[in-house]
Amino acid sequence: MRPSARLLLLAVMLSGCASVATIDVAVQRPSPAEVLRFGVDTFAFANESRTNNPGKPDLYANYCFVMARGVIQFQRFARFEPGAPRLTADEYTERVKRVVARASWRDPLPPDDRVVIPGYASLHAFSHDQEAAVKAGLVGRFWTLVHWTNWRVVFPMPRWQQERVAREALAEVAEGRPVQLLVTNFPTWELNHTVVAYAYRQDSDGNVLFTVYDPNDPREPGRVTFDRAERRFEASRLYDTHVGPIRAFRMYYGALL
């Protein structure tokens, strides 16, 4: 690897919080309630698999990054008003585009400045009733596929770096902020995906169990485990993925990352 490439890789590995509590300290903080409410603050439809749906005419595939990011954007920049009159499908699409046009790492907007979604009480109810309109508004799939940090999946990462990701995720969730993670088991061509971590707990062995929203499965939460002894992540319960070691990286938490 060229020196310039090594420096770039090191910069990405070290990027993030300037000071993060050790994992022993961080995991003792209780996971706050309702950082994200599954089945309320999540989409009602799935990002679909091309492999599992060959020939499907209305296939909605390769939107996992858009959907995971969108859940955070709706949480930070939208406001639902169930008592207000409903809009047309085209008007709803424009509202969705306004929500997702704002970078997901930016601070939440105050209620009066948020994009109003009238006629629905939650993202789940909205995306269930107005699925086509919501999908039409979730733009930007191409840029997620070519995001410059996607190259991280091809490199083995040191265990200390993966522990740092776990510590940062714990710190963010403890402060009430869900965390989007890029997860991969490359070079196995099974998992190059993204999830949103929004809760955590310890198991009896002291491992950290992150509860995640998986865009591929709108029916139940997933789980990603950080094995503290091995200092690595595992796919404990991700849709259509074998249980086993993975690598995880934070996504969309800054202008370059």
Language model segments and positions:
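Bacterial N-terminal signal peptides that target proteins for export
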Residues: 1-8
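Cys-His-centered catalytic/binding microenvironment captured across papain-like cysteine peptidases
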Residues: 20-26, 188-192, 201-257
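Generic detector of well-ordered alpha-helical segments enriched in charged/polar residues
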Residues: 24, 65, 69, 143, ...
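Cysteine-nucleophile protease catalytic domains, especially the papain-like/related folds used
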Residues: 29-160
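Active-site-adjacent substructure of cysteine-protease-like catalytic cores
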Residues: 158-202
